[in-house]
Amino acid sequence: TPGPDTIVFTSDWEPQTSQAIVDRLVDLVSSGSLQPDSYSLGGTVEALEERVASDLGKEAAIWMPTGTLANHLALRRHCGIKSRVVLQEQSHIYHDEGDTLARLSGLNVIPLATDRPYFIADELQVALDQSVDGRVLNPVGVVSIESPVRRQAGQVVPWDEMQAISHLCAEQAIPVHLDGARLYMMSVATGIGIRDYADLFDSVYVSMYKYFGAPFGAVLAGSSEFM
């Protein structure tokens, strides 16, 4: 059985009891290795943000309590006044976040690849064209990709397809966000580095609790201006 310091990249990790979480936190505080932070400035939190940003090859990162919040704020920040978000129909954002993009930020989602793990660049191009060629101009503000896709048994968006989508969006000045909650697991499975994946995206979210064993938390990374 893996211990509390073990990192497992083959699953989402075993659920922890409240007592186990408290005991672990007490041990960490007692060790004297945690540096205090004030309003998220300095200390252990900032060190974590800097480490994740460095590992992903991004300029900056910010810790957040949940991945749902990280995804939401990233998409909202990218969109600005362009209120459309293209994503996978099987994504966590579409199915499991309570329509918060529409409820809280007035963003409208365009789900592609119904009952499939991913869409391809040609499908995306059709959606982008429809957003600008219709009777009312309503351009896409951001494209979001989840990989691995939990609802599709953890299937991974192929590297070539990720590259094609990233290049297509770059040509049209549309930012791309990676819901990389399981990015490290994907990297282990494919042999492609986490930085190589992150390079294709303007922003990346990674989970801190799934395989790292943290009680909760997420980190969102991107450019300094984006943050």
Located regions from the model:
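Conserved PLP-enzyme active-site core in the AAT-like
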Residues: 2-227
